[in-house]
Curated annotation (Swiss-Prot):
Pfam families in alphabetical order: Oxidored_q4
Single GO biological process annotation from the record: photosynthesis, light reaction
InterPro entries in the record: NAD(P)H_OxRDtase_bac/plastid, NADH_UbQ/plastoQ_OxRdtase_su3, NDAH_ubi_oxred_su3_sf
Reaction(s) catalysed (UniProt annotation): a plastoquinone + NADH + (n+1) H(+)(in) = a plastoquinol + NAD(+) + n H(+)(out); a plastoquinone + NADPH + (n+1) H(+)(in) = a plastoquinol + NADP(+) + n H(+)(out)
Superkingdom, natural source: Bacteria
GO MF term set: NADH dehydrogenase (ubiquinone) activity; quinone binding
Positions of transmembrane segments: 20-40, 78-98, 103-123
EC number from the UniProt entry: 7.1.1.-
Topology within the bilayer: Multi-pass membrane protein
Subcellular location: Cellular thylakoid membrane
Protein name in UniProt: NAD(P)H-quinone oxidoreductase subunit 3
Gene that produces this protein: ndhC
Keyword terms: Membrane, NAD, NADP, Plastoquinone, Quinone, Thylakoid, Translocase, Transmembrane, Transmembrane helix, Transport
């Protein structure tokens, strides 16, 4: 019975073991432990006094002028949103472009559909005036 339990535990462990990934697992554990350790150390060693000067924002060594709550024009957000959309498009299309010669015609058609959808969205935003500053 002890032999069976040993065999079961060995097979159970080998089911989850990924040979060759020990270094990656070690790196993953260390890269997770270092920031956690830094945050805990900061929490334990940081001074706890909250005076008025300590609560001021740092503005290049100068006293802050005016309030920090100002309104930005909504156009900044529209340009940022369009930038993010096309930046994500680049992230999706780069791996496709790298493996283009191996993927074949179907992948090319899928990429064309993806680009067409984004161009329709760009044309819609342009037609609605989202890209005009006036």
């Amino acid at each position: 019975m002890a032999v069976n339990a040993r065999l079961i535990s060995k097979s159970y462990l080998s089911m989850f073991a990924l040979p060759g990934y020990d270094a990656f697992l070690g790196f993953l554990l260390v890269s997770a432990a270092v920031p956690i350790l830094a945050l805990v150390t900061n929490k334990l060693l940081a001074p706890r006094s909250r005076t008025g000067e300590r609560e001021l924002t740092y503005e290049s060594g100068m006293e802050p002028i005016g309030g920090a709550w100002i309104q930005f024009n909504i156009r900044y957000y529209m340009f940022a949103l369009v930038f993010v959309i096309f930046d994500v498009e680049t992230v999706f299309l780069y791996p496709w472009a790298v493996a283009f010669h191996r993927l074949g015609l179907l992948a090319f058609i899928e990429a064309l559909i993806f680009i067409a959808i984004l161009l329709v969205a760009l044309a819609y935003a342009w037609r609605k005036g989202a890209l005009e500053w006036s």
